């Protein structure tokens, strides 16, 4: 397999920042690396940091669910492996309204 790096880019306007998980995922897709079967999230946190502080943010979870298989493994540094669908069991879904 391939290792695709990503880095967190922040600026004064947090809404314009992007997380490393999304950078790596978008880079992999732009390079034609499909299908992607494993995602890895490494958060720079102190050894005694709570597991929740090491988890991918909600935006990254949503993007991963839209671009990866729901059964894909996500390896989270300091936490372990989880299936993607466990990280976001009820994702946002944009569906066309049903017309009766």
Q: Where is each model-derived feature located?
A:
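Active-site- and interface-proximal helix/loop "cap" or "latch" segments in soluble metabolic
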Residues: 17, 21, 27-36
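C-terminal binding/interaction regions
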Residues: 31-100
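Generic, low-specificity signal for short hydrophobic/alpha-helical stretches with a mild N-terminal bias
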Residues: 6-7, 69
């Amino acid at each position: 397999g391939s290792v695709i790096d990503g880095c967190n880019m922040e600026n004064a306007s947090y809404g314009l920042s992007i997380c490393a998980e999304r950078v790596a995922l978008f880079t992999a897709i732009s390079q034609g690396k499909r299908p992607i079967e494993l995602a890895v999230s490494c958060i720079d946190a102190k050894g005694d940091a709570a597991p929740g502080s090491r988890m991918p943010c909600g935006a990254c979870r949503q993007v991963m669910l839209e671009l990866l298989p729901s059964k894909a493994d996500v390896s989270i540094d300091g936490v372990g492996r989880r299936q993607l669908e466990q990280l976001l069991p009820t994702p946002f879904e944009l569906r066309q309204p049903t017309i009766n």
